[in-house]
Amino acid sequence: MSDEKLEQNGLSRRSFLGTAAASGAGIAGAGLLGLAGCSKDGEQAAANASGAAPVAKAQGESKPGQLSSEVGPGELDQYYGFLSGGQSGEMRLIGLPSMRELMRIPVFNMDSATGWGRTNESLKVLNGNITEETRKFLKDSGLRCYPNGDLHHPHLSFTDQTYDGRYAYANDKANNRVCRVRLDVMKADKIIDIPNASGIHGLRPQRYPKTGYVFANGEHITPVSGVGKLDDAKTWNAVYTAIDGETMEIAWQVLVDGNLDNGDADYQGKYSFATCYNSERALTVQGASSNEQDWCVVFDLKAIEEGIKAGDFKEVNGVKMLDGRAEAKSKYTRYIPVPNSPHGCNASPDGKYIMLNGKLSPTVTVLDVSKLDDLFAGKIKERDVVVAEPQLGLGPLHTAFDGRGNAYTTLFIDSQMVKWNIDDAIKAYKGDKVDPIKQKLDVHYQPGHNHTTMGETKEADGQWLVSLNKFSKDRFLNAGPLKPECDQLIDISGDEMRLVHDNPTFAEPHDLCLVAASKLNPGKTWDRKDPWFWQDALEQAKKDGVELEKAAKVVREGNKVRVYMTAVAPAFSIPQFEVNQGDEVTVYVTNVETIEDLTHGFTLEGYGIAMEIGPQATSSVTFKAVRPGVHWYYCQWFCHALHMEMSGQMIVKPK
């Protein structure tokens, strides 16, 4: 519908978007709007959803912040942002407040620029920790590796409740994997399969004393081996996984009820959490949204570790699995009832509270972490842990924090960001006549995740908030039917939120982690003394009597040929080599440049091969020489004035 037709029908673009979103939510029945209409607050939320003016409740002489997003030429950002790439399979690195994209880190995807998914080093990461069942599937399917991924929820490693600059972790919902990215080189060094679970979604690292565990939610219920039956969905379960963040091996799994959504960990190292929908064990949208309540599952880490030591588990596909189902009356879990289909799960930076975002309810449920000991001891009931449940608006999905006692929640249906005070919400829950909502700000459009600077640590600084919006509509020049997402930068340093900048992003960010630049110290070149990524190349070179840093040698072993060369602008150390048609060829290239930002590449024409070789790195690729003739190779990185001359030839002699 055009803007002109919208206006003729008495609808603004925002009204149209809000109505469309609310209509879409209607498939869940009347639950969402019904809950929204259960009070005056709900009436206001429903009004906002239909396009009414936003509510602004600034207190006294409240003023917006005055931060600037401008980062001039040659100036540096104050924060790194680790942005999920969603179905692109990659992780993205941005600077804040400029919102400039600094780097794309290929992880679960195949990448033409760097050769990720084609080089031997990347294939070792992609396939080095997969199950035998996956290995057989890839072989039978004629695949070197999975060609795609759906990367959600990047989060950094912790020591003592704050980022330690070592690793970033993220999940692959499409193919049930978890990755680790080394922050010194911004490359994935480990990717593991998660057996028994389906649809790895929520992912969070342990905060204290360190990471520790990385917790991964299996979203989709399936017939877990030894428990479920293929033809009876009522016997299907989800699986919660704890991964050792240092070894990237699975420590344990817990069998649970319902579809696990998002999760978080406490600040004390005692508990972890997962929101859960589909308590009905249904297989359709309508069926999975019929109950008035679902739950949050709380996991007692000490009890689980003791259960593992005591042997209270079953080994399922090589993994130790404990029974955390409600029907088992498990000592490892507690199920806290919350309104229908909770989504986001966020711990406040003071370590006191867990926020469970309602999605189909206009509420956020606030859990008091200090009450969990009594809950597991049987001294109180599950809902006694709830200390607030403010009604904020339609479609609350995720909550972030400023470290000053305020929370910021995305309202998907209302297309708004709502700022509210946690203490006031607790007072209101006790019956005090206080409104916790401080301000509502329009965002554009339909926000999902949000994140504040350092907001997931004890060092939350309350400077910036980023809203990851699922629709951009009219915010940018029309780029065709597929529109970019819209990431919006909001200044939260003052009393009022202030929208500062719109940033288009390619499909599709699902989360963001904002860390002070001072917390990280990436290298400027690769370290030859830390050859983890090219360890196999180093070992093979030693067997062949080759020193990689001085290599210019071709080694033949039957029909296997290994070509060792170096790259120094503007030449490869081997300008030409010959092989026979049908040979298995491995090319090793070592970039011996010692200065930063002098990356080389190796592209072999007509063979679908291109790879990146960073300063002081070694990269390799293996292929079969099936095409006879002359095939040029060249450096695809513009590294020198004689860049185009940096080339050579592979001559393939026909049979």
Model regions: which residues?
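N-terminal secretory signal peptides
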Residues: 1-15, 23-30
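Short loop/turn segments immediately following beta-strands, especially the blade-tip
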Residues: 98, 186, 299-315, 367-379, ...
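A short beta-strand motif characteristic of beta-propeller blades
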Residues: 103, 144-145, 189-193, 249-254, ...
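Extracellular/periplasmic metallocenter environments
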Residues: 551, 613-655
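N-terminal edge beta-strand
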Residues: 555-581
